[in-house]
Each structure stands twice: as C-alpha cells, then as structure tokens.
Amino acid sequence: FEAAPANTNFVTLDQNGTVATIANGAGLAMATVDAVAAGGLTPANFLDIGGGANEESVLKAFNEIMRYENVRAIVINIFAGITRCDEVAKAIIAAKKQIPALPPLCIRLAGTNVDEAEKLLDAERIPLLPDLEACTQKAKEYIQ
C-alpha cells in the first residue's frame, strides 16, 4: 500500500475485511470499528480522516479503501466540528461519480453544516442514516 493521505491515520486491520470504515477523530474511528465488529462484520481498516478534512482528503481516503478487494460496504461516521459535513458530502458525491466500483455507503453525519450536507446528498439520492447502529445494520444487509 502507498502512504495514507496526509492528515489521516490509516491502519489495515484485515486484508480480507468486508467493511471499510471512515471516521474523524481516533475515538470515533475506534468506536466505528468496534461497532462493525460487534455487528458480526469484519472491519478491513481503521481510518481517521482527522479534523479539518476537506473534499480532496476524503476522496483520497476513498481511493485508499478501494485497494481492498473484499470490501462490500463502507461505514462513514462523521461528527463534524472543524470538519464540515458539507465538505464530506461533496467528497462522497465526487467519489460515487469517479469510482464506478465504489461499494455501498452507510453514512452517518452530525455537526457543522449537516443540513447543507443532507440537501447535497438528497439531491444525489444518497441516504443518510440516523446513527452508527443503523449504519452497521445497513452494512450487514449489503453484505448478506
């Protein structure tokens, strides 16, 4: 694997994992990985995009995840403070357009500019889920 995108913490957990994770902040990223595992799924990675992530850095994170051949769902868990939900939403939209083989996304966004993010994603028919538990359940549905 190449180096992880700047300002991110990327750790491979299982090359054969079926669920990739993206979160901001180490604690939230660990909670996301734990929730995926507690749901009976195998997390492929730990990916903390850090504070202040923008469209470019999030798009690079998606490209890094695409190196995992067995990933069949991506759980995205963002609590925005410095990072803005609308920037993450723009990256998600760009990734869906630029990466044809992108696995299904299970997205939870909260915090700064979440209303704007919801409008952007809704316009592209990309659903948001209310919480991490719903994301894990949706990932399980995609995999089964």
Go through the PLM ranges and name each one.
Residues N70-G111:
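C-terminal hydrophobic structural anchor segments
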Residues F1-I76, L109-Q144:
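ATP-dependent carboxylate/acyl-activation modules
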